[in-house]
Amino acid sequence: MYVPKESQPKQGGGASGKVKDGKRKIVAQNKKARHDYAIIDTYEAGLVLTGTEVKSLRQGRASLTDGFVQIDGNEAWLHNAHIPEYSQGTWTNHTVRRKRKLLLHREEIDKLASKSEETGHTIVPLALYFKDGRAKAEIALARGKKEYDKRQTLREKQDRRESDRAIAAAKRKQRGE
């Protein structure tokens, strides 16, 4: 019996064991950026990578902690993202922290360029993932948080967690557990 390709189950995404979020296989996330910056707007950008970079990403090896995005001329570039060398690579291996071109539409680049020139605004990478077999980067226009903003965010998160625990405990008590 013929089964159309869309309804066939997807094959596994490799041995990396990283989280799959719908059709996205997330390779790396920048949790520090979400803590240090207030996210204003997010964009999805394609990445121009070499073969060994793709293979290293498929193994689930990357770090965006020190990464940032810079608009140079009419092109967006991802700087300081760490993609380690591919273990089976030879002399064709890539440079670990080279700048990588981001693929965005012209109007998105223009909007990011104008907004990032405003004081306090920057462009940070949030995640690297594969979507339909293509490497993508989620980038965000962000504004830096002050120290008291970070403390307030942590306090709100802790309060939310405590209230969720209290609600769960009340429900358990009500059920008689």
From Swiss-Prot:
InterPro entries: SmpB, SsrA-bd_prot, SsrA-bd_prot_CS. Keywords: Cytoplasm, RNA-binding. One of its GO terms (molecular function) is RNA binding. Residues 1-23, 148-177 are annotated as: Disordered. The keyword RNA-binding applies. It holds the Pfam family SmpB. It comes from the Bacteria. SUPFAM superfamilies: Small protein B (SmpB). GO terms for cellular component: cytosol. GO terms for biological process: trans-translation. Belongs to the SmpB family. This is SsrA-binding protein. The gene is smpB.
